[in-house]
């Protein structure tokens, strides 16, 4: 499945292209319906999928009751996250994953290696017009 990059304004006044995917989450434990769609950044440098706490709260998670962990971004600063089992909805697929939640995330969500890349082969193609990426589902035994 092919998707166009999303064009986002930068702090420097220009624009940048991001590989972002329409995403939803649901609370697996409560069999709840998925939340409203939001854009999640595809980030091969992220170890796991991380979402803003407000999204977890909207599906009934008690964020601070999750398994406490830490993640470190490119700044080198450690950020406390809370892990929860959720259902991740991406176009055409529903995945059961363990994801981190924090109120320190400056965007709605990040799709990382554990939880996303382990299920998809992602091919980035910034040379196409418009620039885009392709997702191919990996089915494991």
Protein language model features and the residues they cover:
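Pepsin/retropepsin-fold aspartyl endopeptidases
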Residues: 1-141
């Amino acid at each position: 499945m092919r998707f166009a990059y999303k064009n986002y304004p930068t702090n420097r006044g220009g624009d940048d292209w991001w590989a972002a995917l329409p995403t939803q989450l649901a609370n697996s434990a409560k069999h709840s319906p998925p939340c409203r769609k939001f854009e999640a950044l595809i980030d091969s440098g992220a170890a796991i999928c991380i979402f803003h706490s407000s999204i977890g709260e909207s599906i009934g998670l008690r964020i601070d009751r999750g398994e406490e962990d830490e993640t470190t971004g490119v700044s080198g600063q450690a950020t406390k996250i809370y892990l929860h089992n959720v259902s991740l909805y991406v176009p055409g697929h529903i995945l059961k994953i363990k994801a981190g939640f924090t109120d320190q995330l400056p965007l709605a969500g990040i799709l990382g290696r554990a939880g996303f890349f382990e299920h998809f082969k992602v091919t980035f193609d910034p040379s196409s017009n418009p620039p885009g990426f392709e997702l191919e589902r990996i089915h494991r035994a």
